[in-house]
A protein has these predicted regions:
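A short LG(V/I)-centered, amphipathic sequence patch enriched
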Residues: 16, 42-61
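Hydrophobic hinge/microswitch elements
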Residues: 130-135, 139-142, 149, 201-259, ...
Length: 315
């Protein structure tokens, strides 16, 4: 059986696009050349890899097995080439990692800015998503690491977690909001207004259940983009959340007001972030990945990153 990496890349594109036309475009090939490549791969393995009788061209059982191995092989080959280039002093490899929405709106872009200043020839690809999807893509070897909530990975020996500093988050509203001038408010008063947040972080879900007394509590507006959520808060009576790591609050320019809630103690663990860097224990990080992680951790430890907090905002 003879299989080359180019054919595997083509099959991955077909599996992702579910179309010979779109798959060919994704790898910059003519449709006829792309089809011949898939057919040659099927001839090498001795069986069909996609069900051509289905409109979505779903992989056959053999195709699913090949796809799983193909992704690992292609990812491993890319990582090998990157590491060799980096060790040769070219510093021109590619880095692929993921990030949760909150770190992606401040901490991580700042770290990338420092990183590309030191490695101007490097190519950085980072994907913003929730921790569940980031975990899946890490397992599929699309990423070397990701930055997100670490609670679900700290006790798993398959992962290495490097914790970042815990940061306090708060409920907040626009400066002209009816609750803006209050020293503190009750949970009932807070929840009488629309809530615009993401509820994926487990600590936030815990607080919302605590305040509402409902396991199925759902916000009025749910989104993974901190900038979009804050636009909703600044243009309505909706309540949002705010805290460190994000540059959203710098752009608010004093228009955000922090809300103290009677039922929430300041030392409550759920009111603090638990972000960190998650990687696979069985996979060695490339030099560029290690360098990026160093920049993220250094920025997290530095005093200048604290400008992302709420100290300069109305309280």
């Amino acid at each position: 059986m003879h299989i080359d990496l180019r054919q595997l890349r083509h099959f991955i594109a077909l599996a992702e696009q579910r179309s010979f036309v779109a798959g060919a475009q994704a790898v910059n090939l003519s449709q006829s050349a792309f089809s011949r490549s898939i057919q040659a791969l099927e001839h090498s393995v001795g069986c069909p890899l996609v069900d051509r009788g289905r409109k979505d061209l779903a992989p056959t059982k053999q195709g699913q097995v090949l796809l799983e191995h193909a992704r690992r092989l292609v990812s491993g080959a890319r990582q090998m080439a990157n590491e060799i280039n980096q060790f040769n002093g070219l510093e021109a490899g590619e880095l692929h990692f993921g990030c949760g929405p909150a770190p992606a709106s401040g901490l991580v872009p700042r770290a990338i800015g420092r990183f590309i200043g030191r490695y101007p020839k490097a190519r950085v690809h980072f994907q913003v998503d929730d921790w569940q999807r980031l975990s899946k893509r890490l397992q599929d070897e699309e990423f070397e690491f990701f930055v997100a909530d670490t609670r679900n990975f700290e006790a798993d020996p398959a992962y290495i977690t490097q914790r970042l500093r815990p940061r306090r988050w708060h409920f907040c509203c626009r400066a002209g909001h009816p609750l803006a001038g209050r020293h503190s408010v009750s949970a009932a008063e807070l929840l009488s207004y629309p809530l615009a947040v993401t509820i994926r972080p487990p600590n936030l879900r815990k607080v919302l259940v605590q305040l509402s007394g409902r396991l199925d509590y759902a916000p009025n507006v749910e989104c993974e983009s901190p900038f979009s959520l804050m636009s909703v808060v600044l243009s309505s009576d909706a309540i949002g959340i705010c805290g460190a790591y994000s540059d959203v609050f710098l752009y608010a320019k004093g228009d955000l007001v922090r809300i103290a809630v009677d039922e929430l103690a300041d030392d409550q663990d759920a009111l603090y972030t638990r972000y960190g860097i998650v990687s696979r224990a069985a996979v060695r990080l490339s030099p560029l990945a290690q360098a990026m992680i160093e920049q993220i951790k250094a920025l997290d430890d530095s005093d200048d990153h604290d400008v992302c907090g709420l100290e300069n905002f109305a309280i």
